Amino acid sequence: MTRYRRVVVKLSGRAIAGSAEFGFDSNALEHLAREIIAVRQSGVEVAIVVGGGNLFRGNQSDRWGIDRVEADNIGMLSTVINSLLLRGKLTALGEDNLRVMTAVPVPAVAEPYIRLRAVHLLEKGATVILACGNGQPFLTTDYPAVQRALELNADAVLAAKDGVDGVYDSDPKINPGARLFSHLSYDEVISRGLRVMDQSAFILARDFGMPLHIFDIEQRGAMTAICRGEHRGTVISSSPEKSEEFGNEVLASPAESTA
């Protein structure tokens, strides 16, 4: 028995880059694909919103001396490349019911995102990979991940982070004493200025009550465990009372957990 029937997985470009940090890492790609397959085999319907930061980021426009909208267009096309690569790896591992849908038309390699068709594909057991965010500039793929989850009637967003196992009260890479939150409300995340995702994504999730799970994609089986109802990382929802199984306690810091 699973807790969730349908989820949207937010997959960053950095997760695809793995140890390479830029471009692609074959081991990271295979790990991601196998984790997705495991969730599908548990009976959960899966849509994936793919980022493109391993190839290009729209906020690099000043560095390249180009217009921000043009830079965001390049970033959106980067998500198409990552989506095709992920589809290719899933296919190589035996998955055959896959679709790549794009918010910006790229008809030679993918089909356009049409909400009702995406819902139909999910109901028929397809894994739907969503590229180009929502087709608009000045956004990362965080906001579109929540938007697509709402449009597709998903039960939750699973935000896969590379090497970060949840939301901390400060940057654990800088502060060894940073403490991991088990649960936070949307308003707590916004008021504390916690930047694990864009605030616009938190606001949209709050306004429509979409649960968010922030977890480390490097932890094998974490996505499947979350869908089964087990706790991994940090859950962000309306209030602690609505997620009593998690509470809003602060867990041990990385230094304490390894002591």
UniProtKB/Swiss-Prot annotation:
Residues 236-259 are annotated as: Disordered. It is found in: Cytoplasm. UMP binds at residues 52, 72, 134-141. ATP binds at residues 10-13, 53, 57, 168, 171. One of its GO terms (molecular function) is UMP kinase activity. It catalyses: UMP + ATP = UDP + ADP. Its EC number is 2.7.4.22. Keywords: ATP-binding, Cytoplasm, Kinase, Nucleotide-binding, Pyrimidine biosynthesis, Transferase. Pathway: Pyrimidine metabolism; CTP biosynthesis via de novo pathway; UDP from UMP (UMPK route): step 1/1. The keyword Nucleotide-binding applies. It holds the Pfam family AA_kinase. Transmembrane segments: none annotated. It comes from the Bacteria. One of its GO terms (biological process) is UDP biosynthetic process. Inhibited by UTP. The keyword Protein transport does not apply. Homohexamer. Catalyzes the reversible phosphorylation of UMP to UDP. NCBIfam families: pyrH_bact (TIGR02075). This is Uridylate kinase. The gene is pyrH.
